[in-house]
């Protein structure tokens, strides 16, 4: 086998415990490569959108993972790259249960808009250097424990920043379609068209739509479509001012309600 190279020096990753007070874990979307890193060298990458305000903050990235018992911890690494720059590296040491760690993302590494986030595994076998043994090397990323750690005090407040909405732990973006007033075919068709529009505008990789009352929670979005008199019975429209024609309003998430459009 190839001799392992010494790891570059980064700020030491920290074992993650409970989320810090006031923080929320922004999960990653499902991607083509998936969450399993198999073989000696493997990587998986996500496009991640951050707002201008978020990009200016010190942000951490949390990773939850589990690896095969055949992976040699002393010569195997999991590295995090942001926009093609490696910002952290840790030995792979999670052979019996899922472990989590956090890496500080340096200032100015993230830019307002879409960014590339990549996890790369370099894996060496404990005892076997044969080609067949490489099929025994794998690291599984736990999507429920992986993503950006962001302040709860910075919810999405602009339509332009819809791509910054957080998916759920399975990587899907829940959309709760709310039909105020009478439920008829015309209203349902109208809200389904609006659902398609926000999914395209927000570039949601995996939108999951259901219909019901306004929903709470940290992930996803409520979508309410209807006459102002009906919509106003469900949400506070005072911030919209006088409504004399079609309007789009985004209400930031709060402890009672997820982000609402």
Task: Label every PLM stretch briefly.
Residues 1-261:
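Solvent-exposed alpha-helical segments and adjacent loops
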């Amino acid at each position: 086998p190839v001799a392992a190279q010494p790891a570059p020096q980064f700020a030491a990753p920290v074992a993650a415990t409970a989320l810090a007070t006031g923080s929320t874990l922004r999960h990653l979307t499902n991607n083509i490569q998936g969450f399993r890193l198999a073989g000696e060298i493997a990587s998986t990458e996500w496009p991640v959108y951050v707002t201008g305000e978020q990009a200016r903050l010190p942000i951490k990235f949390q990773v939850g993972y589990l690896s095969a018992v055949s992976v040699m911890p002393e010569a195997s690494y999991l590295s995090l790259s942001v926009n093609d720059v490696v910002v952290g590296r840790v030995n792979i040491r999670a052979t019996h249960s899922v472990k989590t760690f956090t890496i500080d993302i340096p200032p100015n590494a993230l830019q307002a808009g879409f960014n590339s986030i990549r996890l790369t595994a370099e894996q060496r076998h404990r005892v076997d250097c044969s080609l067949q043994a490489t099929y025994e090397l794998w690291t599984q990323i736990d999507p429920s424990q992986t993503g950006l750690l962001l302040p709860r005090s910075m919810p999405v407040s602009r339509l332009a920043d819809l791509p910054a909405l957080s998916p759920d732990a399975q990587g899907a973006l829940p959309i709760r379609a709310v039909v105020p007033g009478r439920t008829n075919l015309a209203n349902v068709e109208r809200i389904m068209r609006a659902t398609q529009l926000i999914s395209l505008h927000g570039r949601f990789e995996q939108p999951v739509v259901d219909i019901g009352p306004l929903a709470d929670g940290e992930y996803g979005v409520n979508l309410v479509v209807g006459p102002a008199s009906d919509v106003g019975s469900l949400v506070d429209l005072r911030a919209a001012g006088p409504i004399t024609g079609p309007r789009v309003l985004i209400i930031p998430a709060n402890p009672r309600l997820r982000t609402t459009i």
